[in-house]
């Protein structure tokens, strides 16, 4: 039996609101606000608990060390971690902000995952995203690659290095990829969504060439579909496809303006996948879709064969979005349950439930090859929660990013997390 494991990003101890992400309306709207790293991480852990309580398998990916002194040394800064960070704080504050970002929490951007039934060699392929469009995100790529190799080291997995960093190869991972299939173990249709051609108001975060490369590396290109995100969606603030569309098994939930070539895409999907269920929200504006992050919900398969939507509180608080959710629940489709989660700390930086997780479909044999340190049950989740409550800072103001005390606190928190990861799991 094949199941899907959600690997959520643990929100790191330097979570802050530096407003680093062009095209991300929430990020810019909240730039300069005081963040709460401890509350942010606890909110994420509560979401993980919600999935466990639904009977699903849950994993997590740890944040890389931040501030990233190890990366800054590659730029010529020398000395101890504290000395390196002090130099950067004095010479290039924007670079320090980028090196302090906790944006690795959004593991939907960690990699593109291609399921074993679809790939040329029958392995699960993870193509690490280069995240080359944004400086702060690009600093994650090598760390993410190392983490993925640590988690998925078995022969059932193929973890690919990030694509070369180039203007026309920007790759932002699973946030721009959807897989549709009769079930997680069946052969599926991989849909790669890329941005509009360069020259618009916001940057092309996902390049067509990058999507083609990911498909080629996993051997799914001959059967893959490539669709362009609509310019209207991007202008409205949908900087990734997962802000306007989400798919699970044979269900596609999408805004009618999500794709530039919607009729052709839906026709091709219907032809390839008998039993496809398309749910479109015809009474929800793009503005409400982005404000509520309805489509950035997690759509998950439940043990009883039905599906649940994991939505942010913003979707409940937006009247138009909540009406659409009730309509979905009342209609004839597999979605029978909705769970509301509070992710305000992440949402204020533009990341909802779907941003915070990387979906990895695995058969039983492959699951046994996953490093157990990164899988959670309720007891391990309790331990991780206590760790965050002990070591994560309560608050970070913009000026705190230059404070050596914060750098030291973050290093201590990361050391405690590494101790958790290397301790026996049974």
From Swiss-Prot:
The active site is at residues 172, 240, 355. It holds the Pfam family AstB. One of its GO terms (biological process) is arginine catabolic process to succinate. The keyword tRNA processing does not apply. The keyword Amino-acid biosynthesis does not apply. Keywords: Arginine metabolism, Hydrolase. Its EC number is 3.5.3.23. Pathway: Amino-acid degradation; L-arginine degradation via AST pathway; L-glutamate and succinate from L-arginine: step 2/5. Catalyzes the hydrolysis of N(2)-succinylarginine into N(2)-succinylornithine, ammonia and CO(2). This is N-succinylarginine dihydrolase 1. The gene is astB1.
């Amino acid at each position: 039996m094949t199941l899907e494991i959600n690997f959520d990003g643990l929100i790191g101890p330097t979570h802050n609101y530096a407003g680093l992400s062009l095209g991300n309306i929430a990020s810019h709207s909240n730039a300069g606000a005081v963040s709460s790293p401890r509350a942010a991480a606890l909110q994420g852990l509560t979401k993980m608990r919600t999935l466990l309580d639904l009977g699903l398998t849950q994993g997590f990916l740890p944040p890389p060390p931040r501030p990233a002194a190890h990366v800054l040394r590659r730029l010529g800064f020398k000395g101890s971690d504290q000395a390196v960070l002090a130099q950067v704080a004095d010479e290039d504050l924007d670079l320090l902000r980028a090196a302090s970002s906790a944006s690795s929490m959004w593991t939907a951007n960690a990699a593109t995952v291609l399921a074993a039934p679809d790939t040329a060699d029958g392995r699960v392929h993870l193509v690490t995203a280069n995240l080359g469009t944004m400086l702060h995100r690009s600093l994650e790529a090598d760390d993410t690659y190392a983490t993925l190799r640590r988690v998925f080291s078995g022969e059932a997995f193929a973890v690919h290095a990030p694509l070369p960093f180039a203007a026309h190869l920007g790759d932002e991972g699973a946030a721009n990829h959807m897989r549709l299939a009769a079930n997680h173990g069946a052969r599926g249709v991989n849909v790669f969504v890329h941005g509009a051609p360069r020259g618009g108001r916001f940057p092309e975060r996902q390049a067509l060439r990058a999507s083609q490369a990911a498909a080629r590396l996993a051997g799914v290109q001959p059967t893959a579909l490539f669709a362009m995100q609509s310019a209207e969606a991007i202008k409205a603030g949908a900087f990734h496809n997962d802000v306007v569309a989400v798919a699970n098994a044979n269900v596609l939930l999408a805004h009618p303006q999500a794709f530039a070539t919607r009729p052709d895409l839906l026709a091709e999907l219907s032809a390839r996948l008998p039993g496809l269920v398309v749910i479109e929200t015809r009474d929800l504006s793009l503005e409400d879709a982005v404000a509520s992050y309805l489509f950035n919900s997690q759509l998950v398969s439940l043990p009883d064969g039905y599906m649940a939507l994991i939505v942010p509180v913003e979707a409940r608080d937006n009247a138009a979005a909540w009406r659409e959710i009730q309509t979905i629940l009342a209609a004839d489709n597999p979605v029978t349950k909705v769970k509301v989660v509070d992710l305000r700390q992440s949402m204020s930086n533009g990341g909802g439930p779907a941003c915070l997780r990387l979906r990895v479909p695995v058969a039983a044999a492959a699951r046994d090859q996953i490093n157990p340190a990164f899988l959670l049950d309720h007891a391990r989740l309790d331990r991780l929660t206590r760790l965050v409550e002990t070591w994560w800072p309560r608050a970070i103001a913009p000026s705190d990013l230059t404070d050596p005390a914060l750098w030291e606190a973050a290093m201590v928190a990361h050391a405690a997390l590494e101790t958790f990861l290397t301790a026996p799991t049974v």
